Amino acid sequence: MKAFFLGICIFVSGLDAFSQRNEEKVQRLRFCGYRYKDTALLRRQFEQQLAFLQVRDGDTIVDVGTSSGAYIGAINVIAGFKNVHFILLDIDIGCLNRSKVNNMIAHYEALRGSPFNNSISFVVNSIDSLWLPLNSQKRMWMFNTLHEIPDKAGIIRQMATVLQPGGELIIAELLATEKRKIHGGCKKPLVTGVELKEWLAAGGFDFKDMIANPIPVKKIKNPYCLFRFIKR
């Protein structure tokens, strides 16, 4: 497969994206991922996750499998941290491109009512490389993505090479149960917590802690969990 590398494209929130905050126009903005329109609902969905993520002022965080970065946009609506740099990383140029990332920023800055306090850039990766320097990052996230990747050992190995020793990797997944072993959206097999810990241990990570079901819904068909791992 041909490797697409677009480099890092930096967007400073609050300029052209925020100028599109007119509500009617924002409704038409196209991007991939979450499209929350209610701040109260967004807060209920993300505040427990934010507490677990422990983002600090000045952090740089790589979001692997980000699509158009909507998770990052959503948490920036309610977050209190400042001067955090988010690197969006995905293989799908149909979702991760300048237009859709700017649309995502415009949507969530309009919902927030002001520009983000943080910066966002993106990197389009390939199957065999994240296109980030070795041992360059301290923090990395992967949300609802690992179950979709055929070569799980390969992507874990790639993330390990980019993270510094002692670096943190947070992985979120809907976990398989006896009754529900397939993801309802992508129709790919879900993983179990045991499998996840085994794969990460083999890839050079130690399990630290986790949080289960941080999303307040009445009925969760599969447990949604965030796992924190530390690179050895």
Model-derived regions, located:
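Class I SAM-dependent methyltransferase Rossmann-like catalytic core
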Residues: Q20-L53
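C-terminal alpha-helical "lid/dimerization" subdomain adjacent to the S-adenosyl-L-methionine
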Residues: R21-L29, G33-Y34, F122, G167-R228
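Glycine-rich helix-loop-beta junction characteristic of Rossmann-like nucleotide cofactor-binding loops
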Residues: L50-R56, I78, L130
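Class I SAM-dependent methyltransferase SAM/SAH-binding core
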Residues: V62-L130
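A short glycine-rich, Lys/Arg-flanked "PGG" loop and its adjoining helix->strand segment in the class I
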Residues: A153-E168
